[in-house]
Amino acid sequence: MSKEPLDEIQWKNPEWIQQFGLFTGNVLDYFSESPFYDRTSNNQVLRMQFQFQQIPPNINPQKYLQSKLVEMTGIEFIIAASREPDFWIIRKQTRLSPKQVNIEQDYYIIGANIYQAPKVYDILSSRLLSSVLSIKGSMELLNKMSKFNIHDMGHSYPTLQAEKEISSSSNTIPNTVSVNTTTPMLHTPATASNINSNGHSSTNLGLNNEISNLAFDNLLNNVINSSNDDTYLEDIPLYGKGSTVESLGVKVNLDDV
């Protein structure tokens, strides 16, 4: 007998059906050939007895078998439902008394194939697992779509077209690193060539982004290496000679402050 789980087995015996046919009168005999059958059941006990005693004439064999099973206790197989010529439900149950049984398992026969009916627990587990996997995939997709930028103070959700443009632009940028060696104190005066249409100097656009990390490092090192232990970064004036603005090389119009 196969060690494969019974709820994953599809069993059939075309040779048996070709020899005996398949109908309600012999469907239990056909089922007894399958790995789902319990050979310690009351059905097997009665089959052994019927080999040595004659079934009364003019009595349906299935009804006679059913009447004998009612008189016994233990595991038994009965036909729970039938729809000839291609569908039957076989039920495995434990009989405690002539009127009391505990249902153990159902099997169904479709054509020549026999299957074990799945339990409700297995069905719900499978459906829940499928749902959880779908939700997990959706969450992963949402995480890929969302991008957090500290400068924007939140998440952004670029469109598919924007993603394609970013991807194409990243593929065209060479894998080289350029270092900005421009002196932080350097200031380019505004001329007619670098004035935009709105009247603002192009060198002042994005000024905060042009301040290099080197300028901040120099400012911090001046405080750390100072011989005066009472000097702190917040003690340095913001404007004027020796101020933070001067150290960073930022030109500020004090009239706008």
Curated annotation (Swiss-Prot):
GO molecular function per UniProt: transcription coactivator activity
Q: Which InterPro entries match?
A: Mediator_Med6, Mediator_Med6_fun, Mediator_Med6_sf
Q: What is the lineage of its organism?
A: Eukaryota, Fungi, Dikarya, Ascomycota, Saccharomycotina
Complex and partners: Component of the Mediator complex.
Question: What subcellular locations does the record give?
Answer: Nucleus
Function as written in the Swiss-Prot or TrEMBL entry: Component of the Mediator complex, a coactivator involved in the regulated transcription of nearly all RNA polymerase II-dependent genes. Mediator functions as a bridge to convey information from gene-specific regulatory proteins to the basal RNA polymerase II transcription machinery. Mediator is recruited to promoters by direct interactions with regulatory proteins and serves as a scaffold for the assembly of a functional preinitiation complex with RNA polymerase II and the general transcription factors.
Record-level GO cellular component terms:
core mediator complex; mediator complex
The name under which this protein is listed is Mediator of RNA polymerase II transcription subunit 6
Entry keyword Transcription: yes
